[in-house]
Amino acid sequence: MKISIGTNVKNGPWGGGNLFAKNLALFLERNHHEVFFNLDPEDLDLILITEPRKTSESSAFTHEDVDRYQKYVKSDTLVVHRINECDERKNTNFVNKYLMYANTYSDYTVFVSSWIKNLYKEQGLNVENSSVILAGADKEIFNSDGFIPWDGKSKVKIVTHHWGANW
């Protein structure tokens, strides 16, 4: 298959979406699929929208670009939209509506958590053709190598993520 991932991949630390795109591309290539980060090939089988906001530095293409591709290049290309963002995590009031509109250009939706899926469902997004795929961890980074048990006295380190409104 020829698959395009809508991310401008950055080298170095750039957030979970960037890591997701890198790891997905690696997995797909290891399984003999061709991966692109643009809409240049005229025979794409699948397009993954990861960031439809054209003002985002990580966006390789928008839902509007995908619409033009389907209208003028290849109409039977499947489109999947990965939703990893919401207003609730940053106390904004425009992201959800924008992503819900962008989602109308997709055939299928992948949410990064049940929480975010339910959030969009409650706001009116049709989640019939969707699933939740939780992020995996890079075992080269997240492992028990060098693990030191907590001594009960030192500060506890807590890691959190924006898959909830608990900020």
Residue ranges of each PLM-predicted region?
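Extended catalytic core of nucleotide-activated donor transferases of GT-like folds
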Residues: 32, 36-105, 115
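A short, active-site helix/loop in glycosyltransferases that binds the activated sugar's phosphate group
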Residues: 104-129, 137-142
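N-terminal pre-catalytic "stem/leader" segment of glycosyltransferase-like enzymes
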Residues: 1-55
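Conserved donor-binding/catalytic core segment of Leloir-type glycosyltransferases
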Residues: 149-167
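A short beta-strand/loop micro-motif in the catalytic core of glycosyltransferases
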Residues: 47-48, 105-114, 131, 159-161, ...
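Nucleotide donor/acceptor-binding cores
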Residues: 1, 77, 154-157
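Acidic anion/phosphate-binding donor-loop and adjacent secondary structure
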Residues: 91-93, 121, 136-155
